[in-house]
């Protein structure tokens, strides 16, 4: 995991230094993981935290036809989760409609990438 996070950070640095925008999608459950991702590029990094309760996510996972690793995996992820604060992440409640969630994400991202 650590090598993968370090590699993502290095690739992000290369793109940022070349003047390009980067989007990384991963769980980054722990603060230490987010610290590795943002090392030396923190001012350029912004997190979006898609928030839902464990029960909401469990119900959604059970509705998937071809993917569900069971409640144990979800429980372990919630146990490992170190919630980001509003100071270091834009938090979106994903119990809203998909359209509402995607619009909020777009509204947050657009000013960051508009040069």
Question: Predicted segments — roles?
Answer:
Residues 1-40, 55, 67:
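ATP-dependent small-molecule kinase phosphotransfer cores
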Residues 107-115:
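Generic C-terminal helix-cap and adjacent flexible tail
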């Amino acid at each position: 995991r650590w090598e993968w996070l370090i590699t993502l950070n290095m690739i992000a640095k290369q793109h940022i230094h070349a003047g390009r925008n980067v989007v990384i999608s991963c769980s980054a459950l722990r603060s230490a993981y987010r610290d590795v991702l943002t090392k030396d590029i923190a001012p350029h990094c912004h997190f979006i935290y898609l928030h839902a309760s464990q029960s909401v996510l469990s119900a959604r996972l059970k509705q998937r036809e071809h993917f569900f690793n069971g409640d144990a995996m979800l429980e372990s992820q919630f146990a490992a989760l170190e919630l980001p604060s509003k100071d270091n992440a834009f938090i979106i409640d994903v119990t809203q409609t998909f359209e509402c969630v995607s619009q909020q994400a777009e509204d947050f991202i657009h000013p960051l990438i508009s040069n």
